[in-house]
Amino acid sequence: DSGTIRLNEIDITNFEAEDRGIGLIFQRPVLYPHLSVSGNLSLASKSGHEEALEEVGLSGFEGRAVENLSGGEGQRVALARALLAEPDVLLLDEPFSALDSDLSVRLLKDVRQLLKKRKCPAILVTHNQQEAEMFSDRILEMSD
């Protein structure tokens, strides 16, 4: 319960979550099942949905019910929503671990390419060394 969170040399410890400039992607997509894909994206931004979905490979998904999405599609919607908020940094907490290995590798490569294109720094938390090596420019290993 002590310490500070600094981003771009600014202490953001006491900022409201939505004002910190940090995007989050979790192991399982955090989406609102009663909302459409577009409804979920509206939580981050009222516009830019078509472009965001195109960037993550989901063109035409705006009206789909999130409950009918596959795991990979759900992660892509979560990514689109996080990026619509234009975060200063994106935190990814085991985002590929619930996906099968082929889909995981494909999504990992797509996310890496998209983040590089947007010049958005990211921190990936993973237990998978190969995943870390494929995704990262630098790796920090934590233990105990």
PLM feature spans:
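Conserved ABC ATPase signature
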Residues: 65-69, 73-75
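Conserved H-loop
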Residues: 119-125
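Catalytic Walker B motif of ABC-type/P-loop ATPase nucleotide-binding domains
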Residues: 90-94
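ABC ATPase NBD coupling module
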Residues: 4-27
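Hydrophobic anchor residue at the start of the ABC signature
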Residues: 79
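Conserved ABC ATPase "signature" region
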Residues: 48-61, 67, 112-116
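Conserved catalytic motifs of ABC-family nucleotide-binding domains
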Residues: 86
